[in-house]
């Protein structure tokens, strides 16, 4: 059984004026290809940057995890490049964060499903989301934010 793709997308998290914001951008649409989904994510991120005036912010981007499917991995890398090109200049630079680094910092381990659960647990402990929240993209974004804040 394959997991549903309806929850595919990306999470975001930032602090502004002492307030923590977390959310996610749902990008999956069976009628759209990877490029079109990336375009939707870019536009949503641009809207967030504009709405919250985040142009002075430095963006952390999780390093894409390449799978076994070569064609898919190349598309993922190309879409990531498109994303970076589109947001470059809209924020004050960006840094790639390896999944292994932020997971290790938060003591998250195990296989993918277990890591998702542990990531979600950390977000739920903030009280920002309901206890039945299943949005691991948002959870990962929050945990990447707190990892980056720890780095200084």
Swiss-Prot record:
Top-level taxon of the source organism: Viruses
Stored InterPro entries: Lactococcus_phage_712_M3, RNaseH-like_sf, RNaseH_sf
GO molecular function terms noted in the UniProt entry: nucleic acid binding
Pfam families found in the cross-reference section: DUF3882
Protein name: Uncharacterized protein near lysin gene
Protein species of origin: Lactococcus phage phivML3 (Lactococcus bacteriophage phi-vML3)
Lineage: Viruses, Duplodnaviria, Heunggongvirae, Uroviricota, Caudoviricetes
